[in-house]
């Protein structure tokens, strides 16, 4: 079993934390991945890339996990956390998605004139 990142107390504090708490406790691998595919982008919108990455790493299904890690890497590049963006891209298992993540990071940096 994986670690829980949202406590019951946190879940009582706001709706997104409650949703994440419930999603962390879904036992079906497919159900867990589907729930996190909705929740992680909401944490990204708030700029909470660390929690988004931790929640994504819990996903057992590699393709779903890799797709979310790609989104998080791109968000890190937008936030100028380039080292973390590269680290997340490197953590992607599927070679094609890893290359796509690196491309997205590079596109963000190029658009900002930082390459």
Where does each model-flagged region fall?
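Non-catalytic tandem-repeat scaffold regions and their flanking low-complexity/translocation tails
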Residues: 1-115
């Amino acid at each position: 079993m994986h670690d829980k990142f949202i406590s019951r107390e946190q879940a009582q504090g706001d709706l997104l934390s409650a949703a994440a708490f419930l999603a962390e406790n879904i036992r079906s691998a497919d159900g867990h991945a589907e729930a996190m595919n909705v929740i992680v982008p909401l944490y990204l919108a708030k700029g909470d890339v660390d929690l988004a990455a931790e929640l994504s790493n819990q996903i057992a299904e590699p393709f779903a996990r890799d797709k979310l890690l790609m989104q998080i890497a791109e968000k890190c590049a937008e936030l100028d956390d380039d080292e973390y963006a590269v680290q997340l891209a490197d953590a992607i298992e599927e070679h094609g998605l890893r290359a796509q993540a690196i491309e997205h990071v590079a596109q963000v940096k190029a658009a900002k004139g930082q390459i």
